[in-house]
């Protein structure tokens, strides 16, 4: 399944114990259970003092982040992770 392939890909990436993990849409096209599994892996990895650079379109992934960098029309804007979602959506609109 797609969920199993994503989990296996992340497990392979983590096998070498990197301190920085780059993830591009790690939970794209997955069902809700698989998405939450992937998010939990990311939470645990970060809790161990590691860094994740995560590209996502999923609002639900924002809570995984300590800092958000939003891209719009080729411009980047950095926000704190606790920025209200309404403000984020207004910026992106």
Regions found by a protein language model. Name each.
Residues 17:
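Conserved catalytic motifs of ABC-family nucleotide-binding domains
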Residues 75-93:
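Conserved beta-strand-loop-alpha-helix hinge in the C-terminal portion
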Residues 21-24:
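Catalytic Walker B motif of ABC-type/P-loop ATPase nucleotide-binding domains
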Residues 55-57:
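H-loop/switch region of ABC-family ATPase nucleotide-binding domains
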Residues 27-28:
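Short loop immediately C-terminal to the Walker-B catalytic DE motif
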Residues 10:
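Hydrophobic anchor residue at the start of the ABC signature
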Residues 32-34:
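Helix N-cap at the start of a conserved alpha-helix in ABC-type nucleotide-binding domains
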């Amino acid at each position: 399944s797609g969920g199993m392939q994503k989990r296996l890909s992340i497990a392979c990436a983590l096998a070498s114990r990197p301190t920085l993990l780059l993830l591009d849409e790690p939970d794209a096209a997955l069902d809700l259970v698989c998405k939450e599994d992937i998010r939990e892996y990311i939470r645990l990895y970060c809790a161990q003092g590691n860094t994740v650079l995560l590209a996502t379109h999923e609002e639900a992934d924002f809570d995984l982040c300590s800092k958000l960098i939003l891209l719009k029309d080729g411009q980047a804007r950095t926000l704190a992770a606790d920025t209200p979602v309404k403000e984020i959506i207004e910026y992106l609109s």
